[in-house]
């Protein structure tokens, strides 16, 4: 088995640090938890889960409900964090599969 060196790991890690730990309108801890599909506030749980599992199922109504509690900037950061987190999980699974092949 050959160990694959990921030439893009450093750049990806920089993007993750900026997105999850950088300044923003939403709390960095919330962005990180959303990315990990962890225990988010109840009002976010359904949308975050949809983004992680079936992003195409998120509706305008889902977002409209969240606008009562979150600004557009906060919602943008939350949605992007969930999407990047979901892709990160899938990438890790894919790289692990390649390593074990």
Model-predicted segments: where are they?
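Hydrophobic alpha-helical segments
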Residues: 1-101
């Amino acid at each position: 088995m050959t160990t694959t060196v990921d030439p893009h790991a450093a750049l990806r890690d920089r993007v993750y640090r900026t997105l999850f730990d950088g300044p923003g309108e939403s709390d960095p801890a919330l962005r990180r938890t959303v990315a990990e599909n962890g225990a988010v506030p109840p009002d976010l749980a359904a949308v975050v889960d949809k983004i992680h599992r079936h992003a195409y199922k998120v509706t305008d109504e889902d977002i409209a409900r969240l606008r009562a509690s979150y600004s557009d900037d906060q919602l943008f950061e939350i949605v992007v964090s969930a999407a990047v987190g979901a892709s990160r999980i899938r990438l890790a699974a894919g790289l692990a599969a390649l390593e074990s092949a």
